[in-house]
């Protein structure tokens, strides 16, 4: 879980940035990305991650980063609270998909963008 170098491709100056990832473990990459976006002139940086493992000093990295907000699902219970972390329940999606499977309906529409 070590970050080498990070480069920005594109323009973020004057924009609100949303970083998307499937999971966050130690928080180093996400914190570094948020800091880079702000250095390049972003107005704000938020992140959305499906699974919040948040091991080691991840909470401190998030708190000390320039992330305005981190939105995660409740697929993994949080170990602590943070004013920067907002949890969204994935239970309604799971319940709807289970019902669709039970009724032999297609679930592909729930997962395709």
Q: What residues fall within each predicted segment?
A:
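PRPP-associated nucleotide enzymes
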Residues: 1-113
